[in-house]
Amino acid sequence: MQPYIKSLEQLVYPQYCNRCEISLSEGEQLYCSQCRVADIKPTKLGNWVRGLQTHHNLDYAISFYCFGEVIQAYIHHLKYSSWNSFLTRLINNAVKAEELPMEASDAVMLPIPLHRVRQRDRAFDQAAVIARELAQQWNLTMDESLLKRKKYTKTQTTLSIQERQENMYMAFQTAENTPKAVILVDDVLTTGSTADACAVRLRENGSTWVGLVTLATPKLKKKYR
């Protein structure tokens, strides 16, 4: 009943964006999503692979934005096609601020895969949505078949770094003869252990350069510039 009353209230007393004055959609407050995108600035910190707890098998790592409530909301809403235009703007702004290294000029974009159980629970794959948009803007190919998640992994917060690496390594399986250069893609980056485990598998099957691109991270610090 409450959602119905709220929708009826918005219909009778519509709310407007404080900046552009268009009608706010359900879930928006004070400012519309488009105006919020304009306020989110890319980190411009470049390659900060040395800042990851586990990075020995990664050559490159960038995170476009610092993770906060606004970015979290965008990631949550990626499953709705109406939000894709906002993702396009977010990535377009970030791509302008970051240049890929020469080693990645012909790289293949690869979203870090979810286990089928987790993907079923989420009903969509954020990493794949982001990777598809990045591939289009960077004019690169995307191939989701290069890496499969064969093992479901529970939370790893109680595990040591070495235990996390071993646990994640066993979770993935790659195709034979992977491309020389691969860019892994995910929504949010924390320790880097998942990406590093993926990189190990890719290197075992032919990849010589593995990078990582994420939409956001809560761990960016300027000392990793």
Please name every model-derived segment.
Residues 1-186, 190-225:
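Glycine-rich phosphate/pyrophosphate-handling loop used in enzymes and phosphotransfer proteins
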